[in-house]
């Protein structure tokens, strides 16, 4: 059974996932031997991914100031903004992979631009889908993308974004991933000429690492 929730903003979704995993997660060890608590197939729909505004709007250029960051969380400010920009940049920046590189350059095609073109040509298109998984490399590598797919749909003048993660570090990565996805969605929506709608994130393995158990409990206590 999938665990499905709908929230107003990104920070709220993150907190609910942390609570769910710490209360109901099963303990398993991953390929590296790390102990985690895991809930399978969490689906979070974020109604206002760009922040509480009462309406849908585009972010000011290169600014994420309207997105609330959980108090005391280590992803914030310039660090969070630079990470979010990687969703749009084709530069790997010395890493084995980045989402932006996989989406914009790795396969020899800019999937973001192609998705924008499809949506400009047909607002109702069901083909504005992008992938990061490269079977030739990722079936043999230990360092593989966690986010596998991003899909865009325009309905009633809004861009609805859906993303799939095969594996998702909820405490350490879900929040910045969601913000980066919002950054990407805002770019696509602006280019297509529509507003930013809901973002839905499906995490097949939603987990928290043992190293973050204590912090996660504190977040829940203070939440």
UniProtKB/Swiss-Prot annotation:
Q: What does this protein do?
A: May catalyze the biosynthesis of dTMP using an unknown cosubstrate. In vitro, also catalyzes the dehalogenation of 5-bromo-deoxyuridine monophosphate (Br-dUMP) and the tritium exchange of [5-3H]deoxyuridine monophosphate ([5-3H]dUMP).
Q: Which SUPFAM superfamilies match?
A: Thymidylate synthase/dCMP hydroxymethylase
**What does the entry say about activity and pH?**
Optimum pH is 9.0 with [5-3H]dUMP as substrate, and 7.0 with Br-dUMP as substrate.
Q: Which organism is it from?
A: Methanothermobacter marburgensis (strain ATCC BAA-927 / DSM 2133 / JCM 14651 / NBRC 100331 / OCM 82 / Marburg) (Methanobacterium thermoautotrophicum)
Question: What is the protein's name according to its record?
Answer: Putative thymidylate synthase
Biochemical pathway:
Pyrimidine metabolism; dTTP biosynthesis
Listed under GO biological process in this entry are: dTMP biosynthetic process; dTTP biosynthetic process; methylation
Give the UniProt keywords, A-Z.
Answer: Cytoplasm, Methyltransferase, Nucleotide biosynthesis, Transferase
| Entry annotation: catalytic residues | 146
What NCBIfam families does the annotation carry?
Answer: thy_syn_methano
Q: Which PROSITE patterns match?
A: THYMIDYLATE_SYNTHASE (PS00091)
Domain of life the protein comes from: Archaea
- The leader peptide range reads none
The protein's matches in InterPro entries, at most eight in alphabetical order, are given as: Thymidate_synth/dCMP_Mease (IPR045097), Thymidate_synth/dCMP_Mease_dom (IPR023451), Thymidate_synth/dCMP_Mease_sf (IPR036926), Thymidylate_synthase_arc (IPR014620), Thymidylate_synthase_AS (IPR020940)
Kindly list the GO molecular function terms attached to this UniProt entry.
thymidylate synthase activity
For this protein, the Enzyme Commission number is 2.1.1.-
Q: Mind telling me which Pfam families this protein's record contains? A: Thymidylat_synt
Q: Which GO terms describe its cellular component?
A: cytosol
Q: Where in the cell is it found?
A: Cytoplasm
Tell whether Methyltransferase is among the UniProt keywords. yes
